[in-house]
């Protein structure tokens, strides 16, 4: 049976950081030491880690980072969750772990009234679309401190009255 945990970054333990780093390194091979360093230096204390466990092993993971965006040249900054580092162990794919992690993220997004943004390659866009994520057209957003040629998708944000979103990672 798969169990899921949500852990604030300030409460994450070293053994969990190591397990996450090993899982991430199975897909993004930068070395476990670099994965740990990246995880430590690119998260804030209130960011969330969503973990999927099979027995005591982490088999799925995503980091929900709390970031800011601006709508329509307004000065008011709005929070969003950056859906980052999403991975499911190769041996546990096709058993809905990824979908369940996303359901947990969506529930959190709704309860806190904070949208989710994610950057993805076109090849995985259909997966997110099935889970009610919407594409934000390139003309509707500007990444202030990040370059990316893939797609930006969102969940839980009405784009009707938005002409431009400025996003700071």
Show the residue positions of the predicted features.
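Conserved catalytic-core motifs of GNAT/GCN5-like acyltransferases
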Residues: 129, 134-152
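Conserved N-terminal entry element of GNAT/NAT acetyltransferase domains
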Residues: 1-15, 161-168
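A conserved beta-strand-loop-helix scaffold within acyl/acetyltransferase catalytic domains
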Residues: 9-12, 17-87
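Acidic/histidine-enriched, glycine/proline-rich intrinsically disordered or flexible terminal extensions
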Residues: 146-169
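Conserved acetyl-CoA-binding loop-helix of GNAT-fold acetyltransferases
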Residues: 88, 94-107
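Short glycine/proline-centered loop/turn elements that form peptide/ligand docking sites
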Residues: 98-102, 123-124, 140-147
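Conserved GNAT acetyl-CoA-binding A-motif
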Residues: 108-121
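Residue-level detector of beta-propeller blades
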Residues: 6, 58, 135-137
